[in-house]
Each structure stands twice: as structure tokens, then as C-alpha cells.
Amino acid sequence: MTAIAVVGSQWGDEGKGKITDFLSKEAAMAVRSNGGNNAGHTIEIGDKTFKMRLIPSGIFAAKKGAVIGNGVVINPEVMFGELDNLEKEGIDISGLKISNRAHIIMPYHILQDTYQEEAKGDKKIGTTKNGIGPCYMDKASRTGIRVCDLLERDTFEEKLRTNLAEKNALFTKVYGKPELKFEDIFEKYLEYGQKMKKYVTDTSVVVNDALDNDEKVLFEGAQGVMLDIDEGTYPYVTSSNTISGGIASGIGMGANRLDTVIGVCKAYTTRVGEGPFPTELLDEVGDRIRETAHEYGTVTGRPRRVGWFDSVALRHAKRVAGINALSLNLLDVFSGFDKIKIATAYELDGEKIDYYPASLKELYRCKPVYEELPAWEEDITNVKTWEDLPENAKKFLNRVSELVGVPLVTVSVGPDREQTIVLKNPWEK
């Protein structure tokens, strides 16, 4: 296998960073193709913890470095802050490559995101207010500023003046907010462009050349399938395609180049922000899972909503993202529990269904149909092999795989890179 994609199969925060870091040890390069600094991921290596939002997780181990593709929206201030921190910790960032076609998050995007969300009041979506959505809006309306534009002074000046005229009219007339000044932005972002220049290239060529040479390439998805702009719980979704199809367009390659799509999931389910969540736990069990697993957002610090494992949502993710392998994290959270529940279906208006409804009204009426399994007492954080797992842990994992219809390739029993049980090396045919 030379091309592996790692996608979140729930609502994000599944632990994709850990499995991509683990897989990147064998990869020539690690590639990110969607989202922006709304996608937090945590990597633990030895006694060091790295929390990043934009730089691909694979930068720690991939032999030829990391790639930020054209589908990513880049906040230069955040990106250079992360790069500076990595350099201070002795991480080699010289192999980073940034697409010349990627779009830039501008200061007005962040303000627009904030003003729009505030104006919605109790109908807010739950955006991270990082300017991701407005940046993608400008991309779709063909007014966005790309990385290549920052490298051309005249082009950037013309686009910035045009965009500021439009944004300032919006801010002052609709939201009653002050204008942004051209001089506060122009030189600062030109400088970002010059600082970025040594990393900028046509990443589509770089990645496709690597695949043509049978090099191992790891593609890192951001967020999760259930947050996909088309296939997720719309409108409570992100602004990009988080399924594997979005990886192809977000890097500039054919969809047929992916060999394996690994869906990453937790042993339970979490979600940040608003939106339907059929298996949500609003009791002491949910609180226990949240505190045991430290379920607080990497980017926002917000407490994550917690629920039981939802196989209906996972089957939906499998279908729309082409998931053919499963990586399950945080199995160790259930040590000491009496029982674990898995949603095998929903009940909608008295009828049992096994699909994920598109209608929000229907989703809010769905009640999970649960199957109950016994948990285990043993501490499993030091378990290295499948054989050494408690029998009840094996039964739970086998049932998850059976219900989703996808084989497990890795199981995580702790946050460290080494706390990973490998059932099958995804790089091997």
C-alpha cells in the first residue's frame, strides 16, 4: 500500500493525530488537504505533548516532511506560531511544503465569523470563530486570496482593496462595527508571504510524483465525516468536505489513488458545539467519561458532549467515505465500568431504522436502540497485544467491527504513540 487516508469517522476529535503520527513512521510524506486551524490535534511523544491546529501531525516522523494542500485554509499567524514552537523543541520543519493554491484566512474572515455567529443568538451553529467558513465562502465566490497572491505585491494589493471595500460595507451597515484599515493588513501579510515563500510549491505535483514512485504517502483528514459539509449533520457542520473524496480535490489528485481509508473512532462518541447527537449522555455516566478521558476541545477548551458508541453513524461514515479499515481509540476509558452500550439502530416515530436521517427534525426525534455489553476491571494501558486484552474488551471490539462492517487495524489503550495495539499493519498488502 502506498496511499493511506486517515479520516475521522465521528464528529472530529477521534484521535486522528495519534494514528497519523504512528503511521507516519513508515511514510515518505504526510499530507493535509482540508480545514484550517479549527482542527486541533494532540500528539504525545515521550514526555512531550504537542498541540497543533494547522501543521500536519506527520511532520514529526514522515521522512520527507509534511504537505499542506490546496484545500486547506491557512491562518499565517497561527501557522508560524506552530512552526516556531516546533523548532524550539528541535523538530525539523525544513521538509514542509505549502500549496501555492491554498487560500489565506484574512483578519476580516475572523471578524465576519464572529459577527455572524453573534447575530444568530440562540440559533448559532457553534463555529470556532476562526474565520474558516467565511474564507471558504470567499473561495466559492471567487474573491479569495491565495498563497500565490501574497507573493505578488500588485495582485495582493488589488484583491485586498476590493475585498476590504466589500467587507467594510458589511461590517458597518449590517453589524454596526468599525471598518478595517488597509494599512493595518497589507504590509503584515506581504511579510507573511515572503516568510512563507521557501515552503511554497505546487503540492499536487509533489504528491503525485511521490505516488508515481511508489513512495508511501499518508493523507490526514481533519474534523470528521459527520461534520462534512454535504454528508454531515447540516447545518451543524464544518465548511469543507471531510470525507475521503475531499482529500483528492484538496490535494489535486485522482480519487482512485487511495489504497486504504482508515476511519478513526473512539470507543464512545463525542461532539463539540450545537447539533443533533442521538446517543448523548446527560448524566453521571457522561460526566465520568468526559473527566476520565479529559474531553475538552484542543482549540476551544470547551467541554465536549459525550455519548455511547453509535454504529448507525459509523455505518453512514463508512458508506460515504469509503472506509475499509477501522482504528479505535480510548478503549482504556472503560476500565472499571460495569457495562458499555452500543447503539445498533434508531427508533423514529415508533419505527426501527438503521440509516442516518438527513432531516434535523427527524434526527432530534430519533431514540437510540442499545445493545449492552459487560465492561472490565483491568487496567489495560500497558497491554501490547490482542491476546493480553480482557475477554470483555475483545468482545466489545469484535462487536464494533461486526456492526460497522469494517475490520479493526489498530486499538489504542492510552495517549502515547507506543500505547497502540497493531492488529494489521495498514502499509502491508
Curated annotation (Swiss-Prot):
Q: Cofactor note from UniProt?
A: Binds 1 Mg(2+) ion per subunit.
Q: Which reaction does it catalyse?
A: IMP + L-aspartate + GTP = N(6)-(1,2-dicarboxyethyl)-AMP + GDP + phosphate + 2 H(+)
Give any single GO term for biological process: 'de novo' AMP biosynthetic process
Q: Which SUPFAM superfamilies match?
A: P-loop containing nucleoside triphosphate hydrolases
Q: Pathway listed for it? A: Purine metabolism; AMP biosynthesis via de novo pathway; AMP from IMP: step 1/2
| Annotated positions binding GTP | 12-18, 40-42, 304, 330-332, 412-414
- Chain sites annotated for binding Mg(2+): D13, G40
GO MF entries: adenylosuccinate synthase activity; GTP binding; magnesium ion binding
Assembly behavior: Homodimer.
PANTHER family found in the cross-reference section: ADENYLOSUCCINATE SYNTHETASE
Q: Which family does it belong to?
A: Belongs to the adenylosuccinate synthetase family.
Tell me the protein's name: Adenylosuccinate synthetase
Q: Which organism is it from?
A: Lactobacillus johnsonii (strain CNCM I-12250 / La1 / NCC 533)
At the highest ranks, the source species' classification is:
Bacteria, Bacillati, Bacillota, Bacilli, Lactobacillales
Which gene does this sequence derive from? purA
